[in-house]
């Protein structure tokens, strides 16, 4: 469990769709940002190629980009997680898979895998947390969105920082990473309330100084 908690400290999530605000190729921009983030010290990367203007409709390009991101993560010994796409994750033997409440069932992932991937589950209500706190196969919770966010078009309602404290008051000790509207200025309070880490998209993809941003996200861990 301690290994999972450490992994969650500075958890970067991105796909090429998150890099279209920059000039040039979104794919090359993602790889460049990921390289800088890895050099700066992120502890986990989730490949989330999903939504409008992503490569979701082009499986070959998505597969190629996933392999490139995985290769970078391996160079830095950082876990490489894939969002929801179980076929891709198992085909390239990703370190882990992250799923939402409406995505692929955890039991299906475990039955199909010939190795034990790390599995994360998104949580947005206390009822979901209670129902899954002792469920076999789930290694950590992604809780949120803590604040409203524009990085995900289909996000659930924001739950607020107190949600983190409420989870711990219920005696739920599953490792958890907070996501949604998180930036350098609110990281300390989120960790103080009990989150093992912070997950960010735009805080890094839109940063003017990725090294400084990652350092600030990690400084209270």
Swiss-Prot record:
One Gene Ontology term, aspect cellular component: cytoplasm
Top EC category: transferase
Residues binding Mg(2+), per UniProt: 84, 103
Molecular function via GO: magnesium ion binding; thiamine-phosphate diphosphorylase activity
Cross-referenced Pfam families: TMP-TENI
Cofactor annotation comment: Binds 1 Mg(2+) ion per subunit.
Record's keyword terms, sorted: Magnesium, Metal-binding, Thiamine biosynthesis, Transferase
Function according to Swiss-Prot or TrEMBL: Condenses 4-methyl-5-(beta-hydroxyethyl)thiazole monophosphate (THZ-P) and 2-methyl-4-amino-5-hydroxymethyl pyrimidine pyrophosphate (HMP-PP) to form thiamine monophosphate (TMP).
Protein's UniProt name: Thiamine-phosphate synthase
């Amino acid at each position: 469990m301690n290994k999972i908690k450490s992994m969650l400290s500075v958890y970067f999530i991105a796909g090429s769709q998150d890099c279209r605000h920059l000039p040039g190729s979104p794919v090359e921009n993602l790889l460049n940002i990921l390289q800088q983030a890895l050099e700066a010290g992120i502890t986990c990367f989730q490949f989330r190629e999903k939504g409008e203007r992503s490569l979701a409709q082009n499986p070959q390009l998505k597969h190629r980009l996933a392999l490139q991101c995985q290769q970078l993560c391996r160079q830095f010994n950082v876990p490489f997680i894939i969002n929801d796409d179980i076929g891709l994750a198992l085909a390239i033997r990703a370190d882990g898979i992250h799923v939402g409440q409406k995505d692929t069932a955890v039991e299906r992932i475990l039955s199909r895998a010939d190795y034990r991937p790390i599995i994360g589950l998104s949580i947005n209500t206390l009822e979901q947390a209670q129902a899954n706190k002792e469920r076999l196969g789930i290694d950590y919770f992604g809780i949120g969105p803590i604040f409203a966010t524009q990085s995900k078009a289909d996000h659930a309602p924001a739950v607020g920082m107190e949600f983190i404290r409420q989870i711990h008051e219920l005696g739920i000790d599953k490792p958890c990473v907070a996501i949604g509207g998180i930036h350098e200025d609110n990281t300390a309070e989120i960790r103080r309330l009990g989150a093992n880490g912070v997950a960010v998209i735009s805080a890094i993809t839109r940063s003017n100084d990725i090294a400084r941003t990652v350092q600030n996200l990690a400084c209270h861990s």
